[in-house]
Regions:
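Catalytic-loop motifs flanking and including active-site residues across diverse enzymes
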Residues: 52-53, 79, 122, 324, ...
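Active-site segments that bind and position negatively charged phosphate/pyrophosphate groups
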Residues: 247, 387, 434
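Phosphate/pyrophosphate-binding active-site segments
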Residues: 1-2, 137-140, 176, 296-385, ...
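Active-site diphosphate/adenylate-binding microenvironment
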Residues: 7, 15-18, 25-28, 33-38, ...
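Active-site phosphate/pyrophosphate- and oxyanion-stabilizing loops and adjacent acidic/basic residues
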Residues: 58, 124, 227, 369, ...
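N-terminal alpha/beta PP-like core and its mobile active-site loop of ThDP/TPP-dependent enzymes
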Residues: 1-336, 454-457
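Thiamine diphosphate
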Residues: 93, 107-117, 390-545
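Active-site flanking residues adjacent to catalytic metal/cofactor-binding acidic residues
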Residues: 280, 304-305, 383, 434-435, ...
Length: 545
């Protein structure tokens, strides 16, 4: 049997997956691993914090289909736990690659630094947060363990964990030619044919339909099938907040994002008022359904998940989305005359939104409108949880919008810009983030600059945690005011602006878009500033009370 090393085998697999770098912070238990990866042409891009490295790798995975965060043992690995939790909740194949104390030096249970209860504490934590774990403590199965973890991650679209003892890095290990292709959920072809007939019968017998597309469309690489289905049958498409960009929002059939009562009225009417609603790969969570303000009649619902299809109250088992949607598209092409009976009339949107600034103080609504007018296909949007995420439901994004939209971990978007910018260098990341979240991970602006990702950061500064103030206000929602517009000067590159008015905001956005360096715009808002989306949500929740 041929021999290899752990770093060489990892890199071989990463390159097969289209991954050409990791993100992370080195420590002594991971020094040799990092050195070997770098020496072999696989760099680990340094961030300011391990959690930020995890967010960057998560965002990279959302674009490329797989991401790697590398860290040291204990103090590094446990700081990545929150990023792993985010990846589990939102079904992202994020690999946590951790250095660890050597196999030999663990003998006798010595009290080595970074150890907690015992040497397996970190492993037990990640058993709760990942779909597969591998500790590479034998040269005979190290390669097959790597392959098993990667294959399971790709099959489930969940994070995985690999631990590399530092004395194992240069072992000669048995090579592996195992197949790392995902083992997709099984298909009952007879049930699938029945499900497709049931769906087409529903569409034929009703006057209007809509599609609600979710994260699993992107995770299973089904964007082209979604587009074909919508355009062949003339069905308008709304996406979930976890799937923005899987269907072009500025297309004539694009509705934007459906988020229950948070969404604009015309989106709510088209989705909730459709005679038939096809929910394709949507994670049915509280936040993706507008804190459960979505009003969807299950008699009219067709629900396609990663495992089953439900039409009304009939469930077709073992009909997974990855097989069902392409087969439905094929059947729909044969049934294309049905397109004429679908009511697709809705207000067309301009090819490019316009914004006319006036000399008045900034509001959340007008800030979003200004930003939308400057975005185009050259940009990727990143939205941090809170008002940055909610306010953007009134925006038609030109490409993709990435967010921790279900797990909702604050501080995600700034380091995620590094991941998105690295994974898709043809598009410039534009980040919208609140001042509270920016105070958590804002230093990763420096990481972006250091790695030549010249992102634009728009910081919504309302003096604290504005999303929570309408729920229960108090001094716990107030935070120190930081002059973050000076951060580019601190890191020695880029430009910064503080803008109080619409005219200043529009000018700063215009200059930032035209520049080729890191830019940071601090948008001053009133303490009680609130987006129309948050106002709509408050009214809906009050009506339910």
């Amino acid at each position: 049997m041929e021999k290899t090393t752990i770093p060489a085998h990892l890199i071989k697999r990463f390159h097969q997956l289209g991954v050409d770098n990791a993100f992370g912070i080195v420590g002594d238990y991971a020094l040799r691993l990092f050195a070997e990866l770098s020496h072999r042409g696989f760099p680990v891009l340094v961030t300011t914090d391990e959690q930020g490295a995890g967010f960057a790798a998560d965002a990279f995975a959302r674009v490329r289909g797989f991401g790697v965060v590398a860290t040291t043992y204990g103090v590094g690995g446990l700081k990545v736990a929150n990023a792993a939790a985010n990846a589990w909740a939102e079904q992202v194949p994020l690999l946590i690659l951790s250095g660890a104390p050597g196999v030999i030096e663990r003998e006798g249970e010595p009290m080595l630094h970074h150890r907690v209860k015992d040497f397996d504490t970190q492993l037990r934590v990640f058993r709760e947060l990942t779909c597969a774990q591998g500790v590479l403590n034998s040269p005979h199965n190290a390669a097959t363990e790597i392959d098993r973890v990667i294959r399971t991650m790709r099959s489930t679209q969940r994070p995985g964990y690999i631990e590399v003892p530092r004395d194992a890095v240069m072992w000669d290990i048995d090579d592996s030619d195992d197949n790392i292709d995902p083992r997709l959920p099984p298909v009952d072809l007879a049930a699938q044919r029945e499900a497709i007939m049931a769906v087409l019968n529903q569409l034929r017998s009703h006057d209007s339909a809509a599609i609600h597309a979710g994260a699993m469309i992107q995770r299973r690489n089904l964007g082209s099938s979604l587009y074909d289905l919508a355009t062949s049958l003339g069905i308008p498409v709304a996406t979930s907040s976890l799937a923005r960009g899987t269907f072009p929002e500025r297309h004539e059939l694009g509705l934007g994002v459906y988020l229950g009562a948070l969404s604009p009225e015309h989106v709510v009417q088209r989705v909730e008022g459709a005679d038939v609603l096809l929910s394709l790969g949507v994670l049915q969570t509280d936040l993706t359904l507008g804190v459960f303000t979505a009003k969807i009649d299950h008699h009219r619902l067709i629900l396609a998940t990663d495992n089953d299809v439900t039409v009304g109250y009939s469930t077709f088992k073992d009909v997974p989305l990855w097989s069902f949607l392409p087969a439905l598209v094929e059947a729909a092409h044969l049934d294309a005359q049905h397109a004429e009976s679908i009511n697709i009339s809705h207000e067309p949107i301009p090819a490019h939104p316009t914004f006319e600034p006036v000399e008045t103080n900034n509001t959340v609504e007008r800030t979003v409108a200004a930003l939308e007018s400057h975005l185009d296909s050259r940009h990727s949007l990143l939205l941090d949880p809170g008002e940055a995420l909610f306010s953007a439901v009134d925006m038609r994004v030109p490409t993709y919008a990435h967010a921790s939209a279900y797990y909702a971990t604050m501080g995600y978007a700034v380091p995620a810009a590094l991941g998105v910018g690295t994974a898709d260098p043809q598009r410039r990341p534009v980040v919208v983030v609140g001042d509270g979240a920016f105070s958590m991970t804002g230093l990763d602006v420096a990481s972006c600059a250091f790695h030549n990702v010249n992102a634009i950061f728009v910081v919504l500064d309302n003096g604290g945690y504005g999303t929570q103030r309408p729920i229960i206000d108090g001094p716990f929602n107030d935070i120190p005011s930081l002059a973050v517009e000076h951060l580019p000067s601190v890191i020695g590159c880029g430009r910064g602006w503080k803008v109080d008015t619409e005219v200043e905001l529009d000018g700063a956005l215009r200059d930032a878009i035209a520049s080729n360096e890191v830019c940071l715009i601090r948008v001053i808002l009133a303490t009680d500033a609130r987006s129309p989306a948050l106002t709509r949500l408050g009214a809906a929740l009050a009506a339910k009370a």
